[in-house]
Amino acid sequence: MRYRLLLLAICLVLGIDSLSSVSIGAPSKQYVSPGTPVTYSDSGSTHVMALQNLATLTGVYGARHDKGAGSQPGQWMWACSFTLSGTNIVGAQIEIYVSWSDGTYADGALGTSNGSLTTADKRRDLKLVGTVVVDQTTSNTTMTASGMAWIPTRYFSPAVWNGTTLSLQNVANTSSCAFTPIPPEQQ
């Protein structure tokens, strides 16, 4: 209340006829500043995730990524590309998950290095961040999807579940995922 009275008194002294014309703070824009992608594939990437020839109704997870100590962005963009072998069935899905970890405990009790999801139930304790949906019947076509994931922990591992009726292509590095930090930037 005192603040309003003081502001009113200042307005009267300065001859300002309306409190609405007083700007308390300058407007600013909020941008994003994408960082360096953390990549996952069979080889030659930041971390290994064995996607080559991933069979139908099976899953894998990638090696655990360490974002580093201190303040780190929690918002990440994921983008995954997959190539199936055979004639695709439109509408089938490949699921993308994330396992958070504090360095001691990991969602789904996933290990620190590349591994397999031993059962379909292993997905229950992971965070589903999105899907890549088969959108055409043409075989050997790469399909890509992307989305946003909230990853507030220092460590994380991505996981992929092949829910289609086909294996991923039996060629190294034709399927991959990338996770890019998207920290906000105040202007």
Place the predicted regions along the sequence by residue.
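Beta-sandwich interaction modules
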Residues: 130-156, 160-164
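C-terminal interaction-tip segments
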Residues: 22-44, 155, 160-187
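Bacterial N-terminal signal peptides
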Residues: 8-17
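Terminal beta-strand-rich extracellular "head" domains
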Residues: 95-142
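Bacterial N-terminal signal peptides that target proteins for export
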Residues: 1-7
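Internal, hydrophobic beta-strand segments that form the core of beta-sheet-rich folds
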Residues: 74-83, 93-101, 150-175
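Terminal (often C-terminal
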Residues: 27-67
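Contiguous beta-strand segments within globular domains
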Residues: 55-91
